[in-house]
């Protein structure tokens, strides 16, 4: 989804 949280989860 959109948002910083979504990016961190992918790390």
From Swiss-Prot:
Role, per record: FMRFamides and FMRFamide-like peptides are neuropeptides.
Keyword Hydrolase: no
Keywords: Amidation, Neuropeptide, Secreted
Gene Ontology BP annotations: neuropeptide signaling pathway
Keyword Acetylation carried by entry: no
Official protein name in the record: Extended FMRFamide-9
Gene Ontology terms: cellular component: extracellular region
Family affiliation: Belongs to the FARP (FMRF amide related peptide) family.
PTM sites of type Leucine amide: 11
Subcellular location: Secreted
